[in-house]
Amino acid sequence: MISNFNLKPADKKSIQILQFYRPVCPCYTYSTIMPPKKRPKLLIFDGNALIHRSFHALPITMKTGKGEVVNAVYGFTSFILRAIKEFKPEMVALALDMKGPTFRHEAYKDYKGTRVKAAPELYAQIPRAREIAEILDIPVFQISGCEADDVIGTIVTKMKDKAENIIVTGDMNTLQLVNPHIKVYTMSRGLNDSIIYDEAQVVNKYGLKPNQIVEFKALRGDPSDNIPGVKGIGEKTAVELLQEFTTVKNVYKNINSDKIKPRIKELLESHHQDALMSHDLATIRCDIKFPFDEKLLQFGGFDREKATTLFNELEFKSLLPRLIQTGVADKKAAALLATARAEDKFTRNTSEFSYHTITTEKDFNTFLKKLKTQTRLAFDTETSGLDALTSSLLGISISWKKNEAYFLSIRQSSLHSQKGGNDLFNWKATDSKDTLHPWLIALKPVLENKAIKKIAHNAKFDIKILEQFNIKIAGLDFDTMIAAYILNPGSRQYSLDTLALRWLNFEKISGEDLLGGGKGKLSYSAVPVEKLGIYACEDADVTFQLWSKLEPELKKSNLKKILDTIEIPLIDCLIDMELAGISLNAPYLKKLEKELDIKIASIQKEAWKICKKDFNLSSPKQLQEVLFTDLKISSAGLSKTKTGISTGADELLKLKGQHAIIDLILEYRELTKLASTYVRTLPELINPVTGRIHTSFNQTIAATGRLSSVDPNLQNIPIRTELGRKIRAAFIAKKGCELVSFDYSQLELRIAAHIADDPMLKKAFKEGQDVHSTTASLINHVPLDKVTADMRRQAKTINFGILYGQGPHGLAQTADISYKEAQTFIDEYFAAYKNIKKYVDETITKGKETGYVETLFGRKRYLEELNASNAMIRKSAERMAVNTPIQGTEADMIKLAMIEVHTFIQKNYSDKISLLLQVHDELVFEVDPTIIKEITPKIKKIMENVIKLSVPITVDAKRGENWVGMKTI
């Protein structure tokens, strides 16, 4: 029906090809890309839709240091990289609208006439989006007189028999193109969620087949494009008509049918021409004439150096790691390209890099002479593995000048394996020439010299390695990984490779470049020393260069003090904690595992009995069927995923009380999760040499500044459930010692009282009242002595819920009360604690103005999402803004307490006390029982006075043989 537009024949150039651009990458041969057998994937991006969606999803405050707004182009780039990673296409294309009227405007002058002109900040980013596409070697199509949808329709039609076509877009216009070989991949919420539409998914969402989408718009219209449709016919009626008659043509053919109500018949007859015109306007044209060669679509080799330069210019530092991972789809071609690029890194221009691998005594002596004159150096260790307790040392690299570094090839096994003993931590008499490599002995005075400032990346690992050889690094001044984290705590991308790209615009030799991949992957020990030397020198060189970039940034942002006074001093404490480890009662856990297996099996049988059939309680798909089909439980208010209604724990909590099976499933999930994560796994983590578990503490994971731990994750062992307490009971003191716990009392609430300067909350703490009972009394308007246990429980939930930025919805779920009750409690809470309300409002307002929130110590968390137009994203950022100053201050206090207590122990009780664990507000020590009474008040005093607040800080102390069976001291 396109003929209704009276377009001139295409060969007379009524539709002109105004722009087509295909960048050519000289480093890649396109003919190697196409797999010969299976259909290749073609990703075709709807540029304008992605740009518009991104602009409205991300805050307009996303700007470069030069003030260029980049929110739309950032979202556009992020979604393109995500789609490429997910689908690994062999072919790609980008379609953009051309400025000016289209054939649809000629047919209907009011086409898109109701659209409000977009902000100039959006239009300014379109050339940047095109630049991104070109730098990624994606061909760009813009055709005069047509929309991007028509270009997409034409290309996928040409390729429907040759490729699996995936249209990547931000709207639903292209759903009409879906068929067995054409799918649509679109954002479903903001930029974080996506969904792929095949024929079944379109029918599931709209109740119509893809080819009926045009028919639907012809009847219903499309307000976003000002397509009129049939006035008076809504979505429901349009769907019903099409389900009965399939097409608009058939609707009119059967206009006198009894199945069409008189009122609807009248509307259809009155607006017949509007329906036909709307049909034409909504139809994506699939026969645009323009020169087309499918070889131009082939994707693979783009110039990463140029791409990295552009990403750095736009300050897309968080996207750089994804850029590294974006490559060609064909495995053989990818392998060839990767090998060639890896070799090129090892043979970079030697005039630029002065890298030296030292293997002879003569060269070492020359190097050592230079080394002793330095006042600052970067160092890095190369090891046989990533476990600092068991790995052998392969060498040390050192740099003190840009593009210059030295690698000392030292093949040294750890001393405990040489001695054949099992005491990893008693090597003070082993630094002799009989046990240590002579170069290590020569390096020891330099590395232990405080006057020579040291720089490292993830210094904790390198220091732990060197401690195996009784080399104790002194003068550690800078850790590039931690510095990058302090500058951008929300990134979670702090590898040396990533930081080199972000800050130096330099692509490092990666671990894969060095070791290879697949079955032929080498171990570090097997890498030729020449290659290992280049790799190691580069690590030290990059670390040194990063220091020169990151230190000024820390100073400019007034964050250097966080590094100097908290994070760097904490490293020694964490190393001692990790090396100390903690004992585990493995037989007890084995017994607990058997009990759990019986309980889990019992729950499973009970669930099967209720449903009258066997099913897998861990399968989301089977749960969906059982809950919503078999048992007909209402799914109203539950989130949806790509596979249907979500059966995640948070969603199932919304169904609590609706059916007996919900509680069973929740209990089953908790038991199976804790069984697999802790009960079965913990014994496997026992170090065979020490007989203890050695967790690793992370300083660069939590955006608030909190520490986290892995292998095992101690922070996630629940304390309030019976099973959680049973798991904690497995952590025990070694023979002849006891565990002593020092736990801050309600620290977050005390910090909140101080920061908000709330008189009622401060009064409660100063008078030693139970703050939860006080809150219960205030919000329920009853005397303290009339507060019930249930009132206190709800008040406790509210006290902490407010600190975590919870609204009535969240509070209703956590407190197990109605939305109305939750809103009433929040109103009463803010009426009682007026300054807490003031703190919440002012913190959010200030965060929107500055782009960040900060702790009492000045640690910053950047939250640009506070200005997001998407309400869900914005509300989430507001919750983070409210919580971060409190939780972040708490984290800083705990870290300072650890530093001071560790120093106190080292000076006075190093052979009788070991700090083992830090979990939230609690520190756990292993102590000689004879000194517990002596040291308890001293450690409490240190912890309670690490900072002065306007309310008292109190610490509770307990002792016992395991982590749970403790008694108050």
Where are these regions (language model features)?
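Cysteine-centered motifs
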Residues: 25-27
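C-terminal polymerase-core module
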Residues: 598-605, 609-663, 831-879, 883-885, ...
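Conserved catalytic core of nucleic-acid polymerases
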Residues: 522-525, 579, 687-690, 694-695, ...
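Conserved "right-hand" nucleotidyltransferase catalytic core of DNA-directed polymerases
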Residues: 271-430, 438, 491, 503, ...
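Noncatalytic, basic helical substrate-engagement surface that gates or grips nucleic-acid strands
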Residues: 35-168, 172-199, 274-277, 283-291, ...
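Accessory alpha-helical DNA-binding modules that contact the DNA backbone or grooves
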Residues: 209-212, 216-279, 290, 594-618, ...
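Conserved RNase H-like, two-metal-ion catalytic cores of nucleic-acid enzymes
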Residues: 41-43, 47, 53-91, 109-121, ...
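Charged catalytic and DNA/RNA-contacting regions of genome-maintenance
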Residues: 36-40, 166-168, 174-211, 401-404, ...
